[in-house]
Amino acid sequence: NCKVALILRDLTEAGVSASDGMEDGLRAVEAAKALGVPDHAGVALFAEIRPEWSVSHNWMLTFAETLVAAGYVPGFIGNTDSSKNFNFDRQCSHYVQATDSVDELRPVYWATEPKVEGEPEEWAPYCPSALTPEEMDLWQSGVIRYGDITANEDYIRQESPLERMW
């Protein structure tokens, strides 16, 4: 049973640092519908926030609200090493606090740090300060290279995030 993570990869730093993510959310919804991804089926649409970018929790909130209103689950991929980029930690933590009592706005969290050699021996992704490592759903812990091909090495702690894939 193969699953695909649907990742919006054409975001810009100017866009994600703005206060309104509705336009990006609508683009993600349109792209999902064009692919035939069913709505109201629990499928996550991920926003990839590049490691060096600044992001606004208001952008995250309106992006997530737009996806939820269209029947999708929000997902965020971000630099979870606060020593490299404290902005994602701070803004994601503001998002967590703002949405704490709204279950449908609970996104799928995908950590990108730390990098480790090989398969991690224990579940220890870095996370925003408002979350615990156990609340990180996926962890991109490294890169695998096969000749000219490069692939991210990603892990899940439990199978439930796969239910959010298409």
Over which residues does each language-model region extend?
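Hydrophobic faces of well-ordered beta-strands that scaffold small-molecule active sites
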Residues: C2-L8, V43-A47, P74-F76, D103-T112, ...
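Short, structured secondary-structure boundary patches
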Residues: A18-A31, N87-Y109
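Functionally critical loop-and-helix segments that line ligand-binding/catalytic clefts
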Residues: S93-W166
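Extracytoplasmic/secreted cell-surface and envelope-processing proteins
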Residues: E13-A18, W53-W59, S83-R90, Y95, ...
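Aromatic-lined carbohydrate-recognition surfaces of secreted/lumenal glycan-active proteins
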Residues: A70-D89
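Active-site beta-loop-alpha junctions enriched in small/polar residues
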Residues: R9-L11, R50-E52, N79-S83, T112-V116, ...
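Intrinsically disordered, low-complexity segments enriched in small/polar residues
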Residues: G25, A69, V73-F76, V116, ...
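Substrate-binding cleft of extracellular glycoside hydrolase catalytic domains
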Residues: N1-Y72
